[in-house]
Amino acid sequence: MRVYEASISYNLVKLGENLTVNTPAKTVEYLESAFAVHPMQEAFWVILLDRKNRALGRVMISLGTLSNTLVHPREVFKPAFLASASAVIVAHNHPSGDPAPSAADIQVTRQLREAAKILDIILIDHVIVGHAESDPLGVGYYSFRATGLL
């Protein structure tokens, strides 16, 4: 039988004051450089937050294809436990530029909301990042919290 030890490591991505991530715009700003690494693939990220919504870190959960990525609640919340985060914001990009949620995006958000309740971790928002020029509203992102779906 093999027994493994779980751990978490940190790589400095930004030096300065603790960034409070409490709006969709700040979420997009915090993850901008992360999404730039793979602009033609969907990437799903979780931002780990303390009790004052200060970022403890960010973790890429999944890197997919041009049009989808696989996400499971277990993988989303594992880093939150390891970092002792009290809340999370999840986000993914739409390489097409249109941030409108798909049926799969809505379903995943519902699953994450239910898992968060059970695990007693606050799911603050799920933000889909696109491009302002492809967004009918012109903002370039979609927030499940702002639209009342979370």
State where each predicted segment sits:
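Mobile, glycine- and charge-enriched loop segments
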Residues: 5, 19, 27-70
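Active-site-proximal loop/helix of nucleotide/amide-processing enzymes and allied scaffolds
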Residues: 1-12, 17, 50-52, 62, ...
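Extended substrate/RNA-proximal surfaces in nucleic-acid metabolism proteins
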Residues: 22
